[in-house]
Design a protein with these regions (language model features):
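Conserved N-terminal beta1-alpha1 strand-loop-helix module at the mouth
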Residues: 2-100, 107, 117, 177-178, ...
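Conserved anion-binding
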Residues: 77, 86-89, 95-182, 189-202, ...
Length: 227
């Protein structure tokens, strides 16, 4: 049996634009609660700091309007998507708004398959190896390890031993600029960043400062993990 068959339940063909964005900066900015009239300014602050992936959770005010505003404002190399996507029918609405990425707190196969049918990226939330491999079988591009605080770095290390290195492992939940290093050393490839990066009502200047702190923290952590 070849190594590919051991590592993948289905051929791995990740979304190319998403992988390019991850190569540039493997951190997903989560703008939970952002309003449509504020989205573009916060997106610009994130992009200027180096971020290339931004999601608007669907439990935000008028999320599809915010996705459309971000897509219109940001350069083509930025990936704009939706988070907290719970049902497959929402994927179509995300695409109509200009979204290119579906992020989920769970690993519903119908949602993952719908995203892949429509040609956009998908990062399902997984908390066990069983969920992780099922998500890959359905076509997941990225595995969102959630909640990271509960899973911890030992889970990252164990998963990395059995999940092909091409698949990004992205811890989400409780990530700060200071605690990325141990996750990277364990085998994580990126992060999803929530309230430590953005909270409703903060100014774009605050978003810019927090984004830069995360980018700096990422660079320091990456150097430490490479030693």
């Amino acid at each position: 049996m070849d190594a590919e068959a051991l590592r993948f339940p289905a051929p791995y063909a990740p979304h190319r634009a998403l992988m390019r964005a991850f190569d540039a900066c493997p951190m997903i900015a989560i703008l939970r609660g952002v309003a449509p009239d504020e989205a573009a300014a916060h997106g610009a602050a994130l992009y200027e700091a180096g971020f290339r992936v931004v999601e608007v959770p669907l439990n935000s005010p008028d999320p599809f309007d915010s996705i459309a505003a971000l897509r219109a404002a940001l350069p083509a190399d930025a990936i704009v998507g939706a988070g907290t996507v719970l049902r497959a029918e929402y994927v179509d609405e995300v695409v109509r708004a200009g979204g290119e990425l579906i992020v989920m707190p769970h690993a519903d196969g119908d949602v993952v398959r719908r995203a892949k049918t429509l040609g956009i990226g998908c990062a399902p939330g997984v908390a066990t190896p069983t969920e992780a491999f099922a998500a890959l079988a359905n076509g997941a591009d990225v595995l969102k390890m959630f909640p990271a605080e509960q899973l911890g770095t030992q889970a990252v290390k164990a998963w990395r031993a059995v999940i092909d290195a091409r698949v990004p492992l992205v811890p989400v939940g409780g990530i700060t600029p200071e605690n990325m290093g141990p996750y990277l050393a364990a085998g994580a490839n990126g992060f999803g960043l929530g309230s430590a990066l953005y909270a409703p009502g903060q100014t774009p200047a605050v978003t810019a400062a927090r984004a830069q702190a995360f980018v700096n923290g990422w660079r320091i952590a990456r150097k430490g993990a490479a030693r």
